Amino acid sequence: MSASNEKWIDGLQFSSLFWPPPQDSQQKQAQILAYVEYFGQFTADSEQFPEDIAQLIQSCYPSKEKRLVDEVLATFVLHHPEHGHAVVHPILSRIIDGTLSYDRNGFPFMSFISLFSHTSEKEYSEQWALACGEILRVLTHYNRPIFKVDHQHSEAECSSTSDQASSCESMEKRANGSPRNEPDRKPLRPLSPWITDILLAAPLGIRSDYFRWCGGVMGKYAAGGELKPPTTAYSRGSGKHPQLMPSTPRWAVANGAGVILSVCDEEVARYETANLTAAAVPALLLPPPTTPLDEHLVAGLPPLEPYARLFHRYYAIATPSATQRLLFGLLEAPPSWAPDALDAAVQLVELLRAAEDYDSGMRLPKNWMHLHFLRAIGTAMSMRAGIAADTSAALLFRILSQPTLLFPPLRHAEGVELHHEPLGGYVSSYKRQLEVPASEATIDATAQGIASMLCAHGPDVEWRICTIWEAAYGLLPLSSSAVDLPEIVVAAPLQPPTLSWSLYLPLLKVFEYLPRGSPSEACLMRIFVATVEAILRRTFPSETSEQSRKPRSQSKNLAVAELRTMIHSLFVESCASMDLASRLLFVVLTVCVSHQALPGGSKRPTGSDNHSSEEVTNDSRLTNGRNRCKKRQGPVATFDSYVLAAVCALSCELQLFPFISKNGNHSNLKDSIKIVIPGKTTGISNELHNSISSAILHTRRILGILEALFSLKPSSVGTSWSYSSNEIVAAAMVAAHVSELFRRSRPCLNALSALKQCKWDAEISTRASSLYHLIDLHGKTVTSIVNKAEPLEAHLTLTPVKKDEPPIEEKNINSSDGGALEKKDASRSHRKNGFARPLLKCAEDVILNGDVASTSGKAIASLQVEASDLANFLTMDRNGGYRGSQTLLRSVLSEKQELCFSVVSLLWQKLIASPEMQMSAESTSAHQGWRKVVDALCDIVSASPTKASAAIVLQAEKDLQPWIARDDEQGQKMWRVNQRIVKLIAELMRNHDSPEALVILASASDLLLRATDGMLVDGEACTLPQLELLEVTARAVHLIVEWGDSGVSVADGLSNLLKCRLSTTIRCLSHPSAHVRALSMSVLRDILNSGQINSSKLIQGEHRNGIQSPTYQCLAASIINWQADVERCIEWEAHSRRATGLTLAFLTAAAKELGCPLTC
């Protein structure tokens, strides 16, 4: 048999098989088929035929000429796929041992590559597929890595036996694990170029099947005989037979991921295209189309980590539509393919985030998270139903629960040095991160993508994403009905991330792309509030939770580092715009004070020493004639100390600027940023120049933020006309705190004065002058109110108020105890507004325990201390994340003096200056614009009736102008101010829950007369507020009379006002406006009703200063015969109208309705 075989090979040596192929295609095809048929005659001897073919191939190659044998070998494999191994094996053996070099256009490689073209041999479609599969199977199994060794003694490493192959493999593993050997040993898969060109020529179906087989996904090429080691002519390289991994299917490829990566990398390196990558990733991630006959060959989703570099390249070049289909296909895959598709999607994001630094020649786009994931998630959630919608929501929850997936971690910027660290080195991690431009661009692009996902799919999707975000951060329980999450998330909840400043930093960029007042902005603000609260809980833990403390020397500075870093970043760094930074700092201050003032809040940082309340309250010193309480360090003190230190430090730095400028010439300082430091251009001078430039920018920013905080701009969301009154109250308290912080710090005022003199920088000088003027004007206003408010409060102490409510503590209340009176009224209003008693009790305990500084009598305590405890009111209606309490606000305000005056003064200025807002059609409330300020002032009066109402009376007496008709702009402004003042007084008198405020307002008889003067000077706009004031006055008379002898003098004053305005009110009965006529009728009814009190009713006097007062007959209201006066005024008005020829229709109907019919 052997001799026979040798004869047929020998007989071919001088045949046309080794000649160039004929030019005629038909003749060529005939010769090829003839030789293929001839070869087929000798395949029966399965042992000898492979050896003969190998001998034939070894004698033919390498060859530089095109011969017929090239296409005969390829066509033989096509016709006899079962013998493909016998043909391919000798060729690849020559490649592995270095005898034959691969060339795409060389021989016989070009013939085998053309075999894979879908246009050839169409009549053999089934055999063609089998042949392609066999060729790829053999090439892949022998495409083992070979290491090029530079050391001479390693040239002969491994032989072709299996034992030697195994030992060689172990040596390779050791070499891979040894760092010092890595530079010398470079892995190379010698058959990858051939496989790459074959796959590029093959149709997509062949490519996909190949990648699934290599990845262990599907056994498409499971058939085939035994594989043997390649035959090597020389001992170069390490050709080995494949060693299958125990964990892979029988038909899988050892290290299939390495084969796939090698093939795809080869294409990129040689052709700079990624067509194979585009085919490989969907083939690996998506379940293959199967039939019942081949379902058993599907193994499922392969491990993703080995393909990280492949995914990185794919997502760098893929279109969003392609990646969206890929993501949906993965999320909707059946459990048989991916038991946990959600975990697979999350792992894919993790791999891409970790692969951002790959130096593969193709970098991910900066907005890859948006293009390939967030955009698809938003689209899926907009479908509202289906597997993709639910799994996309779950994927979003998982991504948000792991913030490092959403934004690049800060490790990208490690090792970066900063040359300028202003203000004591408070340099945040954000600044260090932004030193890497790629990180900044990625954060910005991702933030823009988040904003797009939130706003591009409608309000329903936006609301759902917001609730998912809050649930992922632990702000909402997963079981809440507001959180619409798939069962897969609720059943296996994740631990929420630890809220911190570094976690929230990237979200600041999202703010810049969100519409003002959107639900998304409110969501981010709630997350910010929760973040600040979490920082404060860590920095200043509650008293009960601090069981074990570290030594103060070790942790004192670390305890407040995160809080100070956050404050520093917002004040001077560019992590947020100036407008956003001022809003966030507003929240920081209010949350700090709320944490410090609420029950259980600690004012000591972690690691500080314990002090008893007696030590704090008793240790005081007299400063500037005022008793100032020495307070412990708390979050507000941390905020204040930073502001004071920053302003003073920047002022000192800028004062040095003119001295180091060129020749000290101030005329050259117009453009302060571009000043050139004199002297040689050295590193020191450049560093000094950078330091001065930074100081100028920081000063501009911090002054702008302080000016914004002082301008009563509420914190968070909404347009300027939709702020709640509670937010306006909080804004006023923040402004008062900032004002008094500067007023009580002489160095800080000196620093502001110095900044005013920086004429070389117009912005700094202007802002400093504006801020200094606002603080000075506000301080003078508060001082004036303090001095003038004492007579009004003294009048209240001489007018005890009787209430029908049951007493809280004692039946007899000392009239001089105004604080107890306010506390009693506050408690009653709390119950009316639905606040729980325990919260009020806690607030009272805070005051009684000395944690909140209090004032007594006429003593004026430190306003800086009071402001720290008082600015604790945070909105509850729109920003549910705020933990402030209105109950606590009222309880603390009732004990304060100057701060209450300060807040009233600021709110008054806002009342006067607020623009008039047009009512919107979709508005559900008529209270907009300046009317919200009226509500805010009413809240302050409810919290501290005596002091707040006294301050309002003083401000109203100063700003109320005469009612003179003028058509110019100044006249219109004057009327506008008067209307608002009258509206405010009417609202305050309508609130009968604050008797002290009612007494003070009713006692201001001159103010009430001026407020109701000139009722008919102008039209309806001015008459209506004045009639409202008369209406509430008439109702107040009825209430005050029931107090007994204590209310006689007050009722007399109000009755005199009504009598003075009676004739004008009767005249309004004939007004052309129906609204005015109706309101004047209401006023007259209330006047007549108050006159029906039994004049003979005797009211026993109360104990006053321990002395029983004599019996007094209360005739305050009934001594006036209102019925007769009304009838007389109606007759006079009728007579006047007859005399002038005016109609009596309206007047006659009103008189009849009032029981005072006109006589003909």
Swiss-Prot record:
**Basic and acidic residues biased stretches:** 170-187, 801-812
Q: Which GO terms describe its biological process?
A: cell differentiation; flower development; regulation of circadian rhythm; regulation of long-day photoperiodism, flowering; response to stress; rhythmic process
Where is the major localization of this protein? nucleus
Disordered: annotated span: 158-188, 600-629, 800-830
Polar residues bias locations: 158-169
Please provide, in alphabetical order, the Gene Ontology terms of the cellular component aspect for this entry.
nucleus
Keyword annotations of the record: Biological rhythms, Developmental protein, Differentiation, Flowering, Nucleus
Question: Is Nucleus one of the keywords UniProt gives this record?
Answer: yes
Question: So what family is this one in?
Answer: Belongs to the GIGANTEA family.
Specify the protein name: Protein GIGANTEA
Instruction: List the taxonomic lineage.
Output: Eukaryota, Viridiplantae, Streptophyta, Embryophyta, Tracheophyta
